[in-house]
Every structure is written in C-alpha cells, then in structure tokens.
Amino acid sequence: MEPLHKDAETAAAAAAVAAADPRGASSSSGVVVQVREKKGPLRAAIPYMPFPVAVICLFLNTFVPGLGTFVSAFTVLCGARTDLPDRHVCCVFWLNIAAALIQVLTAIVMVGWIMSIFWGMDMVILAISQGYKDQGIPQQL
C-alpha cells in the first residue's frame, strides 16, 4: 500500500506545480539542476597544476606519502590556482604543508598512505578538468 501513497504524493505535488505555473502545465518546461561539491579547506587548497606536474605529484605521493603534496604546496607559490580564491597565497601554502604533514604522520597506520594516494589522484583529476576548461572542450559525465 505504501507505493500508492507515494504516487498520490507525487501526483499532488505535480498538480500544485501545474497550478502555480501561470503558463499551465507543459511537458516541455525543464528544470536546471546545479550540483556543487562542498569542499573542506584542506581539500579546497589542492592546486590546479599542469597535467605532467600533477602526475609527478601522484607518483611521489604513491611511493613516499606526503612528498607530492609537499611539492604541490610550492606550486601555489608559483601561481597555481586553488578553490580558495579569498585566502592569501601563504595561507593556502601552509594548508598544503599541513596536509602533507598529516599524510606523513599517519602513514604509519596506512591511513596517511591511502590519503596521500587519493590526494594525488585528486591533483590529476583537477589537472584534467582544468585542461578541459582551458580548451573549451565539454566534459563527458
């Protein structure tokens, strides 16, 4: 009986939307949905680097946890953009250094090593997405 109740709620919601729409209910009216990822300050401090640099940082993070993140901190000082435009460059640099230290200190219990590898993968993903934006090529989802 529960599915019928949900169908009734859906139908009632659709009727309310149609009644509120001054143009009447039209099947061609679309809804634009925007999805935004909420990132914490450490995650948002990952810089958008050129693809080869991001791959090098991934390899460094894979074999020596935190080393690639440490190198990426210096790319911020060289002008790499981050998702923290309102923060000063030095603040973003120190956030990356903090992330590298967390990765090094927790590598003993494997948490830091896994975090370091994921951090490197995020760097490569950001480099690829930035490359698509620079070239104006639409990304496939």
From Swiss-Prot:
<feature type="transmembrane region" description="Helical">
    <location>
        <begin position="87"/>
        <end position="107"/>
    </location>
</feature>
<protein>
    <recommendedName>
        <fullName>Protein stum homolog</fullName>
    </recommendedName>
</protein>
<dbReference type="Pfam" id="PF15795">
    <property type="entry name" value="Spec3"/>
</dbReference>
<feature type="modified residue" description="Phosphoserine">
    <location>
        <position position="26"/>
    </location>
</feature>
<feature type="transmembrane region" description="Helical">
    <location>
        <begin position="51"/>
        <end position="71"/>
    </location>
</feature>
<keyword id="KW-0597">Phosphoprotein</keyword>
<keyword id="KW-0472">Membrane</keyword>
<keyword id="KW-0812">Transmembrane</keyword>
<comment type="similarity">
    <text>Belongs to the SPEC3 family. Stum subfamily.</text>
</comment>
<dbReference type="InterPro" id="IPR026673">
    <property type="entry name" value="SPEC3/Stum"/>
</dbReference>
<keyword id="KW-1133">Transmembrane helix</keyword>
<dbReference type="GO" id="GO:0016020">
    <property type="term" value="C:membrane"/>
</dbReference>
